[in-house]
Amino acid sequence: RQQQFEKCLVQTKSFPCRWAPDAGLGYGEPVFNFYGQFPYWIGEIFRILKLSVLDSVKANFILTIVTSSIAIYFLARKFWSNTGATISAIFYAYAPYRAVDIWVRGALPESLAFIFFPLILLFIKEFISTNKNKYLFWLILSLAGLTLTHNLSLLIFAPFAIVWTLFWWWQSNRSKHLIYDLTSAGLASLLLSAFYLLPVIFESSLVTLNQTTSGYYDFHLHYATLRQLFLSTFWGFGGSTWGPNDTMSFAVGHMHWIVAMILVVFVLIKKRNKEILFFISLGLFAIFLTHGKSDFIWNLVKPMAFIQFPWRFLTMSTLFLSLGIGAIYKFIPKILTSVLLCLLLILNVGVFHPDIWRDIS
């Protein structure tokens, strides 16, 4: 896609780019009319710096890991100390699903979306707390960035962002103008990305979108099992198949769910830091949406069919569990915190590699 995006810019000189010239057996397809363009604009920056197309994509993936870790660090810093924020950042970077996105699926847009998730939550929280318009400005840009990066990630993230907003609004003075301002920010972000959204909305009837929600892409066929989510140590470079015999991992992360459950026990016993329960509850609900028991929700909310794969909600479990886990340093000795981080790296760092190393010159 990076190569086709560049070819579209150079050959057609169109802005924004709509057409992938060589797709569709050489006839071309309106790929960038429906897929977010922002990842490929970033890729063009690396191309300007004289990186090859392949190296530009690699650099983009590296950027997603580094920048997303920094983003959640600043979010977690609003709740925990520097130590807690660092813990959250490390858990966010080394969640198994992050490796799936990069090394198994090669899902650049979804990987890039991991940057915007914590930024949006941060700016919502800061605006509600301070009522400063600068946070509203950055919120608009972040929402537009997520929209232009991966519209399915926006669909997945939006309900959680709304719950996040209402929770912190309820904790504040509950001023109605805060809701009005945040709603206006959401609308402004849609206007900012209208050059992409309007064609998606009004030209979808010109393509066969029904094929994206039926057959192999029917979400009913891709629920994860409890074993896959919590117990399995399987790692593969295949894909999501019908039924439980998938050839890729849907693991939440052993350290992620175990530490999260330990935190819940500590919070319930000590009866403090209730926001930890909020973060972990959102993460657990996201995990629930990956499982077949959530089928009634998927059938009720029709637009969810476009998400295709319920395990995509591992993006949200990774986000909120990592955020909550940052508080673990409050309840255990410093040496145990270091042990937990070492265990995380030992268990997960080994999956951050490709299936086959190829020497391409």
Task: List where the protein language model places each region.
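Membrane-embedded transmembrane-helix bundle of lipid-linked glycan/lipid transferases
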Residues: R1-I360
